[in-house]
Structures are given as structure tokens and as C-alpha cells.
Amino acid sequence: MKTIHITHPHHLIKEEQAKSVMALGYFDGVHLGHQKVIGTAKQIAEEKGLTLAVMTFHPHPSHVLGRDKEPKDLITPLEDKINQIEQLGTEVLYVVKFNEVFASLSPKQFIDQYIIGLNVQHAVAGFDFTYGKYGKGTMKTMPDDLDGKAGCTMVEKLTEQDKKISSSYIRTALQNGDVELANVLLGQPYFIKGIVIHGDKRGRTIGFPTANVGLNNSYIVPPTGVYAVKAEVNGEVYNGVCNIGYKPTFYEKRPEQPSIEVNLFDFNQEVYGAAIKIEWYKRIRSERKFNGIKELTEQIEKDKQEAIRYFSNLRK
């Protein structure tokens, strides 16, 4: 996949861009709804013998336009989003820098410069996609703005539990600890990436060594508690349990940030500094304070057995 980063005004020459069918959207999470949009564009591209292109934007428009209701943390930071869009068969990805100048374009200017001007023959987007200043351009106005110079297709919404599959729906699920629902909406396990860092090394003294994780990006971290997870380290994938929390059994004063600690099953390596990817599967329980090490270790063993049963049933 060819990735082209654009800052407005772009200086790309139309004739040098491949004739394409383009899917447009912010695509945070690259969830099932987004996959339907890109999949629709792919099908049309194959039928017409054209290149499959995707256009996304960075940073999130709400960060630029000051809509505080949007969270700062993303389901998929840009690097992860690019990788997932590539996996869907995209041939060319345009990453447009979203800034105030770009946001001030009229709908017609956006179409002329970023659709027609990039040699797009057919545009595809979800029913709620908007473009141009104040989001005044919609999928209903797009045919008029295209003025016969390109076609367009609107993709209807996908629903789950009678609710539209959306990035905000997934963010809410993750913030509530409902990683199972989030995974259904995403069409794959939610994951975060980080580096194994030094912790207080207490886990190994009680028989449950853990890898402490420092995050690479501003991911949405599920709420405190214990989760069944899979973790990829050094190219190998292991089942495990992850504790997100403040370790109230050991700390009277609550630390500023919760720690992310993973106990991997059948794993006994020193991996400080290694990259780690954690996939979240099920919330086992909330965080609690125990009356000593014995009670804590007994509960950790129960958590481990529950995770083992969960992954055993998952394979059936």
C-alpha cells in the first residue's frame, strides 16, 4: 500500500494519481461499519478495474475544532489505523492533516480539490459522512457537488443490539469494561501496544511474575479490573490475565496512574524493553483490596483458572 500524507493546500497532480474508487472517513477503530464502507469501495473498484483508495484524516476533527465531548484517546492511533486499512486490501491511502485551514474549505472546494483533484472516479462513504465547513456537505449533497465528474455510493448503517455500530459506541463499551461487546463491534479483539517496562517485581515473589506495560500511544485503556487477554511478545502469542489497577493491597496511597500488568501462562522470559501487543477478551472481575498475600494469591489463581477455561471454550 502506498501512503500519501497531505497538508492543505496539496500540490498533487491529478494526472499522476491513479484513477480510483475512494472510501472516505475518519475510521477510528476500523470497525465493522468502516469495513463495510471500504469493502463496498473495493467491490466497485474491482468491477470498474480501478485502484482502491482510502482517505482518512489526522488528528481527529474534534481535537482541532474544540468539541470537548470527544475523548482524546483513540481506539486505533494513526499507526494502527494505517496497518488495519492496508489489511483490507487498500492500494493507496491518503492521510489528510486536519487543521483549521482545511476545515474552512467549502463542500464544493473539498470535492473539487480532494475528490476530483485526486483523480477519484467514484467516492464511497457512510450515510453520516460530512465534509466541508461546518460539515455542511453530506452524502445527499455529494452528487450535486460532484457535478457528474465522478459517481458516489452511500453505505447504510450497520447495527448491533439495535444500535448503530460507531466509534463512540465502541469507546463507551471499552470505558465500561465491556471488551466482549467492543470486540463484536470491531470484528476483532481490541488491542493496545506498548513496551515491557520495569515494575516493582512483586509478582514473581508470590508466584505470578508479570510484565508491566508502558503504552506507545494514547489508547483507550479499559477500567480497573482483571481481564482475560492474549499477548504477543517476540513473535509468540500467549494467553494470560491482565490486571489494570492501583494495587490497593500494597498501597495505602493511590498512585497517580494505574499500572497494566500481564501474567502470561507458560511463559518465563526476561523481556524488558520488548514490544508487546495485548488483545482484550473478557473482564473477569473488578479490582479489590485483599487482607494479605495469601488471599491475593488464591484469587489470582482463581482468575487464572477462569481465563484458562474461557480460552479453552473459545477454541471449541
From Swiss-Prot:
Family: Belongs to the RibF family.
Record EC number: 2.7.1.26, 2.7.7.2
Keywords annotated in UniProt: ATP-binding, FAD, Flavoprotein, FMN, Kinase, Multifunctional enzyme, Nucleotide-binding, Nucleotidyltransferase, Transferase
Name the record gives this protein: Bifunctional riboflavin kinase/FMN adenylyltransferase
InterPro entries named among the record's database cross-references: Cyt_trans-like, FAD_synthase, Riboflavin_kinase, Riboflavin_kinase_bac, Riboflavin_kinase_bac/euk, Riboflavin_kinase_dom_sf, Rossmann-like_a/b/a_fold
SMART domains: Flavokinase (SM00904)
Protein's GO biological process: FAD biosynthetic process; FMN biosynthetic process; riboflavin biosynthetic process; riboflavin metabolic process
GO terms assigned for molecular function: ATP binding; FMN adenylyltransferase activity; riboflavin kinase activity
Coiled-coil annotated residue ranges, if any: none
Pathway entry: Cofactor biosynthesis; FAD biosynthesis; FAD from FMN: step 1/1; Cofactor biosynthesis; FMN biosynthesis; FMN from riboflavin (ATP route): step 1/1
EC primary class: transferase
Reaction catalysed by this enzyme: riboflavin + ATP = FMN + ADP + H(+); FMN + ATP + H(+) = FAD + diphosphate
A Pfam entry, by short name: FAD_syn
Function according to Swiss-Prot or TrEMBL: Catalyzes the phosphorylation of riboflavin to FMN followed by the adenylation of FMN to FAD.
